[in-house]
């Protein structure tokens, strides 16, 4: 089968030179951020996009014989902090606001909380590589498609609305992975409107399935921060399931008005951190499930005949 896609670096004009790997295949994006694999194995595939100093893009696709599968993703810049394992330390990301610098993520590591993967003690320098998604414009860099295992029915999935998510990796100076020996406290300002004491789901990303999995809850404190404890590091997400959705409909056409087929569209929320995916039908129509009455950016990647199309517009979800 064929896999075609588009990727780029958030807040950067770089589109070319990003390494993309579905399985054992590998290529780099062209100057427009496009990539293509004409002999991808049929079946489920994990498409990774990597670039030094950025998060890893992760999408999960199905590849079919003699058909084209499309996908899209973005990568987000990471920051690296250090502290001595014996002493512990605090990682605190911040950004400039109209009121000065504000903390966007805090992770508190107690002394001796970081160990080797086999559980043995580690006393050296810990390198913490982190990235924080706290705005809808950054959601393209989130792994997967914002689907989670339904807590009511583990065989089903449910879309999520996020209020902030982050990823963290712990390594030695040589790049050896490190682990936590105890839970650590994290907090970050929750996106949206919340009340002190609100309990919100805490989800972690399962790279094997491409789904978010609920691992407990966190609480909104008096300053509007989401506060929780985590026992390991991967992507962590503060979410609530979207139980009611609305079909955002449209028609994908080329420059001459001819319907585009063989692709998909992705809706990314403008006024909320969520969205969805939808396939483009043979007549060019599509339907993407989104939060009712929400504003969304619609991004398209498709192949029609020998032409690869990309496009972007906006749309509003209907009533529930």
Q: What are the residue ranges of the model-derived segments?
A:
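Predominantly extracellular/luminal cell-surface or secreted proteins
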Residues: 8, 23, 131, 203-205, ...
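Residue-level detection of beta-strand scaffold positions
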Residues: 19-23, 33-35, 45, 214, ...
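Predominantly extracellular/luminal regions of secreted and cell-surface proteins
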Residues: 104-152
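Short flexible loop/turn segments that cap and initiate beta-strands
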Residues: 13-23, 119-126, 181-183, 198-199, ...
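Periplasm-facing N-terminal accessory domains of Gram-negative outer-membrane beta-barrel systems
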Residues: 3-40, 46-50, 60, 70-71
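A short, solvent-exposed loop/turn motif at the edges and junctions
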Residues: 22, 42-66, 74-76, 291-319
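Short, mixed charged/polar active-site loops
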Residues: 26, 56, 102-106, 273-275, ...
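Proteolytic cleavage junctions
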Residues: 1-3, 31, 52, 59, ...
């Amino acid at each position: 089968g064929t896999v075609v896609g588009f990727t780029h670096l958030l807040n950067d004009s770089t589109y070319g030179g990003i390494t993309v790997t579905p399985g054992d295949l590998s290529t780099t994006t062209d100057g427009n951020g496009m990539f293509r694999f004409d002999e991808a194995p049929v079946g489920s595939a994990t498409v990774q996009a990597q670039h030094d100093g950025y998060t890893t893009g992760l999408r999960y696709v199905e590849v079919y014989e003699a058909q084209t599968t499309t996908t899209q993703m973005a990568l987000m810049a990471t920051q690296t902090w250090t502290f001595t394992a014996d002493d512990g330390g605090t990682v605190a990301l911040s950004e400039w606001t109209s009121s000065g610098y504000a903390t966007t993520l805090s992770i508190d590591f107690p002394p001796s909380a970081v160990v080797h993967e086999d559980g043995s003690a580690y006393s050296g320098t810990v390198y913490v590589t982190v990235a924080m998604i706290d705005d809808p414009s950054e959601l393209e860099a989130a792994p997967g498609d914002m689907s989670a295992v339904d807590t009511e029915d583990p065989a089903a999935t449910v879309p999520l609305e996020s209020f902030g998510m982050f990823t963290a990796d712990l390594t030695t100076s040589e790049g050896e992975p490190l682990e936590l020996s105890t839970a650590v406290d994290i907090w970050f300002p929750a996106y949206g409107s919340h009340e002190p004491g609100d309990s919100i789901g805490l989800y972690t990303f399962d790279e094997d399935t491409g789904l978010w999995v609920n691992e407990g809850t966190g609480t909104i404190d008096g300053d509007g921060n989401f506060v929780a404890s985590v026992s390991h590091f991967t992507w962590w997400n503060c979410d609530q399931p979207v139980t009611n959705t609305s079909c955002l409909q449209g028609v994908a056409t080329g420059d001459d008005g001819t319907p585009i087929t063989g692709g998909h569209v992705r809706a990314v929320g403008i006024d909320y951190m969520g969205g969805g995916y939808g396939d483009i039908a043979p007549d060019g129509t599509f339907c993407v499930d989104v939060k009712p009455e929400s504003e969304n950016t619609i991004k398209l990647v498709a192949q029609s005949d020998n032409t690869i199309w990309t496009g972007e517009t906006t749309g509003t979800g209907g009533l529930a």
